[in-house]
Regions:
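Residue-level recognition of short, well-ordered coil/turn positions
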Residues: 42, 125, 179, 228-229
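Short alpha-helical interface elements
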Residues: 40-42, 58-62, 144-145, 173-177, ...
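A metal-dependent hydrolase metal-coordination microenvironment
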Residues: 2-130, 138-139, 144-147, 152-170, ...
């Protein structure tokens, strides 16, 4: 029987799930963000200003959905901030009009952060762990975290600022450790350059494609919750399904497509140039998960979530 891992029906909506405005330390107003992201084909932006949750109902329209979110930071007290390890996490609200967050004590401690994550998740929030390399964090800092929904596999702002926006290895560690987190690619834009043609522009570099029934808050949030999405800096994962123990993927033209697992039982196809658009993989019964990665000749990469073996066989 054919089982779609990305829904057969619905529409892919382009989303930036990490954004800052003048409401914290960004340079653009929320309305400016809406117009600039609409012009680049985005339909969803999570307004995740620092340490304050602000709904933006005035931005809702038939072609644009603002997600209500907040980014919370926890800084290690043992070093100056420039050298300190930090936790930064986004919390996406299930209620578009929510304007208060879960009470918490700001303590740099994995158990304290996990406690907040679990309490936020109990209230319906989706919790995303952000930019581990920029945060100077080690595996021991993020692998024990509880309550995570998403993992930021790419962050444009960190890549522009310090060339450390990728977290693909850290994401792989999470997968191997049994964490079934959803990968996201985000901008974390602050728009300090205030010029989209500038080499310092930190918008439009990484995005998440969410497949949902419609562009309503409920449908987008539920699709995110179910992991019906993928992260990318370029390539598209257009179809993904499993049938009779074989996974199938259809992509935009790519130069490499991989099925990656909990072990070395993997399968990759490669080409000179972007001439590949599909691949298939017989799922070994003893692996713990399978995920898809694709790459194009421009250096763009796409990541599916890790599909647990129980979802595939």
């Amino acid at each position: 029987m054919k089982k779609y891992l990305l829904p057969e029906s619905g529409t892919f909506y382009k989303a930036n799930l990490h954004c800052h405005t003048v409401c914290s330390d960004g340079r653009y107003t929320p309305e400016q963000i809406k117009q600039k992201y609409l012009a680049e084909g985005y339909a969803v932006v999570a307004f995740s200003d620092h340490n304050r949750i602000l709904p933006h109902p005035e931005l809702r329209s038939d072609d644009f959905l603002p997600l209500t979110a907040i980014e919370i930071d926890f800084n290690a007290p043992t070093e100056p901030w420039s050298h300190a390890s930090v936790y930064h996490l986004n919390y996406f609200s299930p209620d578009p009009d929510r304007d208060t967050f879960v009470p918490f004590e700001r303590v740099y401690d994995v158990d304290a952060v996990s406690d907040l994550n679990l309490r936020a998740a109990k209230e319906g929030f989706l919790v995303q762990y952000n930019h581990p390399r920029w945060s100077f964090q080690q595996a021991a800092d993020f692998l024990p975290l509880k309550g995570l929904w998403g993992f930021e596999v790419y962050n444009t702002g960190c890549e522009i600022e310090m060339q450390n926006g990728w977290a693909d290895y850290e994401f792989e560690l999470c997968c191997r450790a049994g964490m079934r987190v959803v990968p996201t690619a985000t901008d974390d834009n602050h728009n300090v350059a205030m010029d989209e043609a500038s080499p310092y522009n930190d918008s439009f570099g990484g995005w998440s494609m969410i497949k949902a029934a419609s562009l309503t808050y409920a449908d987008i949030f539920e699709a995110m919750k179910r992991g019906e999405m993928y992260a990318t800096t370029g390539p598209e994962i257009r179809e993904l399904w499993v049938e009779n123990g074989v996974m199938h993927v259809v992509t935009s033209p790519c130069c490499a497509i991989s099925f990656l697992t909990s072990g070395r039982e993997t399968s990759t196809v490669r080409a000179h140039g972007d001439s590949l658009t599909e691949h298939r993989f017989a799922v070994p019964e003893h692996v713990k998960f399978v995920r898809v990665q694709a790459a194009d000749a421009n250096g763009g990469r796409a990541f599916s979530r890790p599909y647990d073996i129980s979802e595939l066989l």
